[in-house]
Each structure stands twice: as C-alpha cells, then as structure tokens.
C-alpha cells in the first residue's frame, strides 16, 4: 500500500487528464473556427489593395535601381492605356465632314514612331469604318463637282443655241424684207429703258414641225433667257403697272397650261399662231408667245394693244399715279388656237382664250360696303364686255372722223345693274372655269395726297373655252384683232354674259292651274308680305303645295325664276320639261 498509489486513484487521474486534453482540443477548434473567417477576409485584402493601388512592393536597400525601372514601366503602361481609351471614345462618334475633309495647310511633321503608335492604338474595325466614310465623302464630292460642271455646260449650250437661232432668224427676216413684215415678223421687244432680247421668229410654216409642248417650252425658254439680261430699274411711278403686267402674265401662262392639258389633240396635231379669222397675222395683232413676253417684261400697254388708243394710254398713265380723276380702264385681248382642237360629242371644237383687265376705284366714304359701279364685287367677265360696249357706243357717236383704233378700251359710264356672277358655259360646249382675280391696291406714303385720292384695284379676267367651228365667236373676225367692232362686242357680251335662271311662260301658267279663292285667316303672301283677305285669288304650286297671291306668284315665275319663293322647288311645268306631281 505504501509503495504506490491505489488503482482507483490512477484511474481518476487518467480520466482527468483525458478530460483536460479534450477540453483543450475543443478550445483550439473553436478558436480555429473563429479565426477562419478573419483569415479569409485578410487573404482577400491584398488583392483589394492591388486594385486600389494602395499596396506597393517591399523596398530593400539594394533595390533602388529596380524601383526606378518599375515606376518607368508603370508610367508607360498608364499612358498607353489612356491613349487607347481616348482613341476608342473618338472612334465611337461618327466622323464629321470637317474631320474627313483634307486639311487646308500641311500639318506639322510627326515622328514615324509616334504615328505608328497612334495608328496601332485605333482598333482595326474602327479604322475600316473611318476609311469607308472618307471614301464615301470623296465620291459624293466628285459627283457634286461633276453635276455642277454638267449644269454649266448645259447652260452654255442653251445660250449658244439661242444666239444661233436669233442669228438665223435675223438673216431670214432681213432677206424676207417687206413680205416677212406683212406676215407678222417679230420685232425687238424693249422694256422701259432697255432691251430684253429678240424672240425667235416663228411663222405658221415653221410651227408646223412642233407640237404644243415644244411651243410652250420655246416660250418659257425665251422668257427665262430674258430674265438673265440686265434690265433698268423701274421707277416708283411704274412699279404698280409692272407688277400688274407680271401678275397677268402668271395668270395667263397658267391657263395656257390648263388649255394644253385639257386638249387631247396636242400630241398629234400641230400648233399655229393665234391669229384672225382669215389666217393672217394682221398689223397690231401679236402672237401669244410675244404677248406673254411683253407681259413678263412689264409692257402691259403694248401687250394689250392699248397704245393704239391715245386716250386709254393717258388713262393708264394717270392710273399709275393713282389719281381719282382718271376714268376707268378696260383692256381686252382674245386669242384662238385653230389646230389645238379636240372632239366633243362627235363635234370638233377650237380653244380660245380671252384676257381682260379692268380698273376698279375704291370709295373713301363710310358706304364702302355698298355695291357701286366701280365696286370690287364686279367679278364677271360680262361686266368688262358691257363696259367696253358702252365705251365703244359713246366713242362712235361722238364723231364720224374717229379712227378705227380709237373705238375700244374706253368706258366713261358703267350701268348700275351690273352684278357678280359665276362663269357660264359657251353654247353648251365644255368650258373650263374662268379666272377672275383682284390685285390688292398699294397706297403711297405721301402727305400731300388728299383723302379723295385713293389707290385703284384691278380685276383680271382670263376665260378659256372650247367652241365649235360654226360658233358665232369664231365668225366675228374683229374680236381677234386690235379693233373689235361694236356688233362683235355685243355678240360676245350676249354669249358670256350673266346666265339667267329659266322662267315660265304665260302658257305654262295657264296649264298649271291651282287657282282658288282664299278662305282662311291670319296668313300672308310671302312674295308681297301682305295679309290674305277673304276671297283673294291665289295660286297653289303642285310640287310643294305652297300658295301665294296669283298676281305675285305669276310675276315671280315669269320674270324672276320658275321656282317656289319659299322652298326653291320647281314652280310650274314648262313646255320642254314635264312636271312630276308630288306623291
């Protein structure tokens, strides 16, 4: 017992030591588990430092040279990275025209190494895109330069051909002598103060080889060439007249295009000069192309043949000064195109164009809204023809010694019953709507002008129609000359005058019936606005069952129009149109 410990005590010590070892191992495991998360985080921290540039290599006493080389390498890498980044940003944007265009002055020479480095810095795809854009720009520039050169060559050829044709026409006119002048040779056209050139002489035989399109193209080419010539500046007094002339030119040329497009014969038939009924171009009558050229040049007086009447020329001169004392001005021209015809319902029709200008004076009183003889509301061509007829009647009755050229284009009195109306058809043949245009007046800034001197307005009439060969207008030869006669003007006024609605005859009223004595109360006639009295004789219209005084409705149906004054239905059956009773 004394030599050693007992067996139970040894077992207890062994168990205690084993328990201590196990507890220590558990503590170590717990500490390892706690430090594992920190270790992983700490292991990641150097990589984060390298990304942020916070960690640097450890320096040693013997590594001074190595550190300088490393810094130099890092600086080179950073500069290369920056250059590549900037190049990518520049290549992302589309190149501008200025960047693609060659430099105006040679750039400063650069070293080969620097150029190669910048070229290598641009990606291959971006370099190809840049080269493609530059090639496209160069091709577009070449096409633009070639088109400009072609336009210049075309303009030069047109000018040379115009000069050659003018030279040939001068030779023909000089060799023809007096005979060519009798057949309507064209003289030099002069604007106020300077010449605008010579229109190519085109007789009836020379126009036999050209159609309507060539004829119109020749006229427009001549007008375009005349624009390039130097013209004298228009004085302020003539500005309104020149503007009016060019406005008439635009309206007339537009209706020529309408006439050409509406005719189906211009593709196969030839075009002749607008001439008189005899086929010869008389002295004083100008061709339509010369008429347009004179209007475009501002020669309204010469284009409308107003210079043949000194009184009308004086009125136009006064109208330019916008004087109230000058009388009304009426200018009138008619043209026909014999070969530009077409078939209409089995009948050949010939186109004609009527151009008219009428001056209108504005009233300065408070009654401007009231219609007057010179009111701008007179917008129908018959107003112009009526004034011309009245003017001619007065001129011919003054003296028997009056010349044939002094009996038109002058009107001192205008009837008060002239009213506006729409354009009507000529003899039932297809007629396009005429053009009626007003030019706004222009006032002068002059303090010396009194209140009664007001500006003028101008009404422009352009009428285009297709008439048959046996139409009375074509059988009036003076209408296509500079001296239309009084009878022909009356004929034209009756043809294009205001169309009245159809009226009933006395026989139609007798057959209509519907007469009865009135037996009601508290009603009145809507024609005379009088109350009906007992046993008043009334007439009831069968179409609408409206009734009126017999005398009132009979006068309305026979003088005004054959329709009900209340509902506008047909009044009584006429001899040509049978009635259809209302169900």
From Swiss-Prot:
Pfam families: zf-RING_2 (PF13639). Keywords: Membrane, Metal-binding, Phosphoprotein, Zinc, Zinc-finger. Residues 70-80 have a biased composition (Basic and acidic residues). One of its GO terms (molecular function) is zinc ion binding. The keyword Ribonucleoprotein does not apply. InterPro entries: Znf_RING, Znf_RING/FYVE/PHD. PANTHER family: RING-H2 FINGER PROTEIN ATL51-RELATED, RING-H2 FINGER PROTEIN ATL66. This is Uncharacterized RING finger protein P4H10.07.
């Amino acid at each position: 017992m004394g030599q050693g410990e007992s067996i139970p005590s040894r077992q207890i010590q062994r168990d205690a030591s084993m328990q201590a070892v196990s507890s220590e191992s558990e503590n170590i495991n717990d500490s390892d588990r706690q430090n594992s998360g920190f270790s992983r985080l700490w292991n990641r921290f150097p990589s984060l430092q390298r990304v942020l540039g916070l960690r640097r290599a450890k320096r040693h006493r013997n590594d001074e040279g190595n550190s300088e080389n490393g810094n130099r390498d890092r600086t080179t890498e950073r500069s290369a990275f920056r250059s590549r980044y900037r190049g990518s940003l520049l290549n992302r944007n589309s190149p501008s025209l200025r960047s693609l265009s060659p430099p105006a002055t040679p750039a400063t020479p650069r070293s080969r190494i620097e150029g190669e480095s910048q070229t290598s810095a641009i990606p291959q795809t971006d370099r190809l895109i840049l080269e493609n854009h530059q090639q496209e720009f160069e091709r577009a520039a070449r096409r633009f330069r070639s088109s400009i050169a072609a336009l210049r060559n075309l303009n030069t050829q047109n000018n040379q051909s115009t000069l050659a044709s003018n030279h040939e026409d001068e030779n023909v006119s000089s060799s023809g002598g007096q005979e060519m002048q009798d057949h309507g040779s064209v003289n030099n056209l002069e604007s106020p103060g300077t010449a605008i050139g010579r229109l190519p002489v085109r007789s009836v035989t020379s126009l036999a080889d050209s159609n309507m399109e060539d004829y119109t193209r020749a006229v427009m080419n001549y007008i375009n060439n005349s624009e390039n010539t130097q013209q004298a500046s228009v004085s302020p007094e003539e500005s309104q007249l020149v503007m009016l002339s060019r406005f008439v030119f635009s309206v007339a040329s537009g209706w020529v295009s309408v006439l050409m497009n509406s005719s189906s014969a211009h593709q196969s038939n030839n075009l002749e000069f607008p001439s008189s009924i005899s086929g010869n171009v008389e002295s004083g009558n100008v061709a339509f192309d010369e008429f347009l050229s004179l209007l475009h040049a501002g020669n309204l007086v010469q284009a409308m043949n107003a210079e043949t009447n000194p009184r009308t020329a004086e009125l136009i001169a006064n109208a330019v000064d916008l004087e109230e004392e000058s009388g009304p001005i009426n200018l009138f021209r008619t043209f026909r195109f014999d070969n530009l015809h077409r078939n209409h319902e089995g009948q050949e029709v010939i186109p004609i164009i009527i151009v008219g200008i009428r001056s209108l004076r504005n009233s300065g009183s408070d009654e401007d809204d009231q219609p007057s003889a010179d009111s701008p509301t007179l917008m129908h061509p018959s107003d112009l023809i009526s004034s011309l007829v009245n003017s001619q009647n007065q001129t011919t009755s003054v003296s028997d010694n009056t010349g044939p050229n002094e009996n038109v284009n002058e009107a001192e009195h205008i009837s008060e019953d002239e009213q506006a109306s729409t354009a009507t058809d000529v003899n039932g043949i297809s007629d396009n709507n005429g053009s009626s245009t007003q030019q706004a007046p222009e006032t002068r800034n002059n303090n010396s002008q009194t209140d009664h001197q007001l500006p003028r307005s101008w009404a422009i009439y352009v009428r285009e129609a297709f008439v048959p060969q046996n139409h009375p207008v074509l059988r009036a030869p003076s209408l296509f000359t500079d001296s239309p006669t009084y009878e022909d003007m009356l004929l034209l006024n009756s043809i294009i005058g205001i169309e009245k609605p159809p009226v009933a005859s006395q026989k139609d009223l007798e057959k209509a019936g519907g007469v009865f004595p009135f037996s009601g109360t508290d009603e009145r006639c809507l024609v005379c606005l009088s109350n009906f009295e007992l046993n008043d004789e009334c007439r009831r219209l069968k179409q609408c069952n409206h009734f009126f005084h017999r005398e009132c409705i009979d006068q309305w149906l026979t003088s005004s129009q054959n329709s009900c004054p209340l509902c506008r239905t047909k009044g009584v059956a006429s001899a040509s149109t049978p009635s259809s009773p209302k169900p």
